[in-house]
C-alpha cells in the first residue's frame, strides 16, 4: 500500500512555494509520493481567467522534473466541467484501491471545508493535510493533520503581477518555468526569449546577454 499525497491547484504558474510545501509534507508524513493535480476549472475560480491547461501542465512538468517522488496526475485536466475534489478522489480511489490518499490544502482553505462539495462523503475517502500559515485559523469540525512548513511570501498571483510589471521572477520559480514564461509570453511578459534571440542579430552574445538578463 502506498501513501499518496495529492496536491491540487491551478499552478498558474507553479513556484518554489508549491515545491517546498509538497516536499515538507512528503517528509513530515513519510509519504510514498506527491501527486500534483492541476485543475481544469476550480469551482472557486470559475469566473476567473486561467492560463491554458497545456501551458500550466508544461510548467508543472518543468517544475517537478528531477524529483523522484513528485509526479503529475492529469485526471482533472482530462475531465470536462468544474474540478470537484470529491469526484476526483472517488475516481482515484477506484483506480488505486490499495493506496491511501492524503489531500494537501493551505490553512486558508481549512475554514472553508464545511462548504466543500459532498464534504461528509469526501472525508471518508481521503485524509486532509492542512499546511499552517500565519494569520489563518486551523479550526474546523473535520479531521485535518496539521503540518508546519517554512514560510515564504510567494504566490502565483505575485508571480503574474511581477511579470506584467516587467520585474524579475528569477529565484521565485524554477529556471525552466521562468524561461517557459518568457518564451511563450505568458502573463503579459514583455519580451520572450525567442524575441531576444531574433533581436540580437549580429550583436555580440556577451553584450546582448547583458542587455537581455531578465528580458530585453
UniProtKB/Swiss-Prot annotation:
Signal peptide: none
Keywords: ATP-binding, NAD, Nucleotide-binding, Nucleotidyltransferase, Pyridine nucleotide biosynthesis, Transferase
The keyword Transferase belongs to this UniProt entry's keyword annotation: yes
Sample GO molecular function, one term: nicotinate-nucleotide adenylyltransferase activity
One GO BP: NAD biosynthetic process
Reactions that this protein is recorded to catalyse: nicotinate beta-D-ribonucleotide + ATP + H(+) = deamido-NAD(+) + diphosphate
EC number: 2.7.7.18
Pathway: Cofactor biosynthesis; NAD(+) biosynthesis; deamido-NAD(+) from nicotinate D-ribonucleotide: step 1/1
Source organism superkingdom: Bacteria
Record keyword NAD present: yes
The protein's role, per its UniProt record: Catalyzes the reversible adenylation of nicotinate mononucleotide (NaMN) to nicotinic acid adenine dinucleotide (NaAD).
Similarity comment text for this entry: Belongs to the NadD family.
Name the UniProt record assigns to this protein: Probable nicotinate-nucleotide adenylyltransferase
UniProt organism field: Geobacillus thermodenitrificans (strain NG80-2)
Gene name of the encoded protein: nadD
